[in-house]
Amino acid sequence: MGLELYLDLLSQPSRAVYIFAKKNGIPFQTRTVDILKGQHMSEQFSQVNCLNKVPVLKDGSFVLTESTAILIYLSSKYQVADHWYPADLQARAQVHEYLGWHADNIRGTFGVLLWTKVLGPLIGVQVPQEKVERNRDRMVLVLQQLEDKFLRDRAFLVGQQVTLADLMSLEELMQPVALGYNLFEGRPQLTAWRERVEAFLGAELCQEAHSTILSILGQAAKKMLPVPPPEVHASMQLRIARIP
């Protein structure tokens, strides 16, 4: 069995892995895991990843369940262009520096709107307005940190070429944009960075990867989304309760 990637393109890390593999011509089989239908909680998927999360990489009997580890593994195994995950010690350390900050600040912050506007209402849960406003303030703060600490006057987050850092960041920032919050507005430096990253990746690949999330609000308004099965409601409610 060749390389298998378990993905749901509603998921930011899934999109990052998908785009990376496609952009670099890495052969793989897509195993779609539809989160809205609760497929991530199925017994079948639990045998692949007992954490019940996507993305997952399965390479024969070898399994990885964290997106950063998956991207690094693919970079090394398929010997992709050095700029993605530089061999230079200091450049690589800077990629890891960003990814560590990303996990603590970007990840979890920019996905909240999906829960407040789509996932919560699907199961009849309303996120308190004060949490929504707090999240908006947090996004503004983190975006400023992203510009001041990482982007600065550079073309990309770690120097003058695209790295794994840019890909992971772009996919997180696309989440609120797709849900009606244009966080790039009034941020010309960040907007120019996004345009450079998307130009490098290619418009067709970006559209393919982003089509699911970009259509989510329209589908929700037309009540075209599947209602998650009752057995996943408890885990969804817990996730919503954890929104700071």
UniProtKB/Swiss-Prot annotation:
Record-linked InterPro entries: Glutathione-S-Trfase_C-like, Glutathione-S-Trfase_C_sf, Glutathione_S-Trfase, Glutathione_S-Trfase_N, GST_C, GST_C_Theta, GST_N_Theta, GST_Theta
Residue pairs linked by disulfide bridges in the UniProt entry: none
GO molecular function, one term: glutathione transferase activity
Example GO BP: cellular response to leukemia inhibitory factor
Domain of life: Eukaryota
Residues annotated as domain GST C-terminal: 88-230
Assigned keywords, A-Z: Cytoplasm, Nucleus, Transferase
Subcellular location: Cytoplasm, Cytosol; Nucleus
EC number: 2.5.1.18
Record field: catalytic activity: RX + glutathione = an S-substituted glutathione + a halide anion + H(+)
Tissue: In liver, highest expression found in central vein limiting plate hepatocytes. Also expressed in interlobular bile duct epithelial cells. In lung, expressed in club cells and ciliated cells of the bronchiolar epithelium and in type II alveolar cells of the lung parenchyma.
Annotated glutathione binding sites: H40, M41, K53, V54, E66, S67, D104, N105, I106, R107
Domain GST N-terminal: residue ranges: 2-82
Cellular component terms (Gene Ontology): cytosol; nucleus
Matches recorded under Gene3D superfamilies: 1.20.1050.10, Glutaredoxin (3.40.30.10)
Enzyme class label: transferase
Family note: Belongs to the GST superfamily. Theta family.
PANTHER family: GLUTATHIONE S-TRANSFERASE THETA-2-RELATED, PTHR43917
Described purpose of this protein according to its UniProt entry: Conjugation of reduced glutathione to a wide number of exogenous and endogenous hydrophobic electrophiles.
Quaternary structure and interacting proteins, as annotated: Homodimer.
Protein name: Glutathione S-transferase theta-2
Originating species: Mus musculus (Mouse)
